[in-house]
Amino acid sequence: MARYRHSRSRSRSRYRRRRRRRSRYRSRRRXYRGRRRRRSRRGRRRRGYSRRRYSRRRRRRY
């Protein structure tokens, strides 16, 4: 676990410097990373609530 944490902090500092150069590539990957993180943390609490809402919206859309 310690190794993983250290590598993560290092990659963060590197990405901050490359943010201006590869803004498109970073936005795509971040995104993706942010989605994964939000699902793991808030997914458990909002699963029931989000399912009710999405089910109604999907039924109307489709």
From Swiss-Prot:
The gene is PRM1. The lineage of its organism: Eukaryota, Metazoa, Chordata, Craniata, Vertebrata. It comes from Dorcopsulus vanheurni. Keywords: Chromosome, Developmental protein, Differentiation, DNA condensation, DNA-binding, Nucleosome core, Nucleus, Spermatogenesis. InterPro entries: Protamine_P1. Residues 1-62 are annotated as: Disordered. One of its GO terms (cellular component) is nucleosome. Transmembrane segments: none annotated. One of its GO terms (biological process) is chromosome condensation. It is found in: Nucleus; Chromosome. Signal peptide: none annotated. Belongs to the protamine P1 family. This is Sperm protamine P1. Protamines substitute for histones in the chromatin of sperm during the haploid phase of spermatogenesis. They compact sperm DNA into a highly condensed, stable and inactive complex. One of its GO terms (molecular function) is DNA binding. Testis. Its main location: nucleus.
